[in-house]
């Protein structure tokens, strides 16, 4: 199985998953990059997976379905183009892989991640929940939901690969360095991120550089407390403070 990022809009990645001469697209913001990829690689579209109902994630799904009407569109009931409604725990297959749907709200009140388990490990298509060195903004969800989604991700094996839908890594790492200026892993990752695409990323890597997965680290909590000017008594409070600090960070 081969997984390829296709660039779309300004900073979106549409993830294309190939098995034989069939492919899945994840979060098609627009149809044309997907169609060009399919033609160039002589592939048939087998499935489309949508994580949440924002135009830069579902905008191309309806057009792709019209072009490939045998191809199901998976998404929650608020995804207009969905032909196959999913909920937490829904399972289906693609190629030799097993797909499990997780509810990972926070960015939006209803947000799904697709966990693809293959012989070479777990691949998580996480939309706008987790970014490398960061997390999604809270729109219609809550920071409590987002924190819980991160806690669940953090229980996966450290070799799990995450496939976010945006390349925000360099900007996120600059904020991470603001929180942990003495973290050598962040400095190394930042230098690399300025030169090349960074995705996908392993959970092991994110545990070293993502402040939103490091809320129990004393240096992270102390820095957050210093910046917000109050005591933070739990991982959730640290997470929420970091999210507010990131919103204001320039």
Curated annotation (Swiss-Prot):
Pathway: Secondary metabolite metabolism; methylglyoxal degradation; (R)-lactate from methylglyoxal: step 2/2. It comes from the Bacteria. Its EC number is 3.1.2.6. CDD domains: hydroxyacylglutathione_hydrolase_MBL-fold. It is an enzyme of class 3 (hydrolase). Signal peptide: none annotated. It catalyses: an S-(2-hydroxyacyl)glutathione + H2O = a 2-hydroxy carboxylate + glutathione + H(+). InterPro entries: Clx_II_MBL (IPR035680), Glyoxalase_II_hydrolase (IPR050110), HAGH_C (IPR032282), Hydroxyacylglutathione_Hdrlase (IPR017782), Metallo-B-lactamas (IPR001279), RibonucZ/Hydroxyglut_hydro (IPR036866). Zn(2+) 1 binds at residues 52, 54, 107, 128. GO terms for biological process: methylglyoxal catabolic process to D-lactate via S-lactoyl-glutathione. Thiolesterase that catalyzes the hydrolysis of S-D-lactoyl-glutathione to form glutathione and D-lactic acid. This is Hydroxyacylglutathione hydrolase.
